Amino acid sequence: MHDLNDFPAQALPDGLRHARHIEAALSGGLDSVVLLHLLSRLAGRLNIKLTAVHVHHGLQDEADGWLEFCRGYCGRLAVPLRWQKVDVVSDVLGIEAAARQARYRVFGETEADVLAAAHHADDQVETFMLAALRGGGLRALSAMPAVRPLNRRTLLWRP
C-alpha cells in the first residue's frame, strides 16, 4: 500500500510539470479536500505556489458552512483561499448546469498556470450520459478530458 504523503510529482501530466502556480477548486467535498491535501504535499516539495478557490453558490442551506469549512481547512494547510459568492439563475438546462457555468466563470479568473478540479468516476459517467441524452457527437461523448485549456494562460486539470 502506498502512503498518500508520497504523492509523486509524476502524477502531474507532462504538460503540467513546469507549472509554478496551481490553484485547486475546493468545494469542501471529499474529492476536492483529498486533492488539495495531496497537492499541498507536492507543492512543498516542488516549490509550487498553491492556492485554492471556493465558489459559494448559495444553493444549499449548508453553503455558508461549506465556505467556513474551506476557510478553516485552507488555514490548517497554510494555503491561500480565493472565494466568490455567485448568483445562480436556472436556465433551460437546469440549476446544476447554471451552477457549473457560474463556477467555471470564477475558475476562469484564476492567475494560476493550472486549475486542478477533483472528480470521481460517477462524474465522468454523468457527463457522458448527459452528452448522450443531448445527442452529443464524438467529442461530447468523450466526457471530461484530463487536461484542457481553461483560459489563455491556464490549463484545467482533472486528475
Identify the role of each PLM range:
Residues 1-159:
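Core alpha/beta nucleotide-donor-binding catalytic domains of modification enzymes
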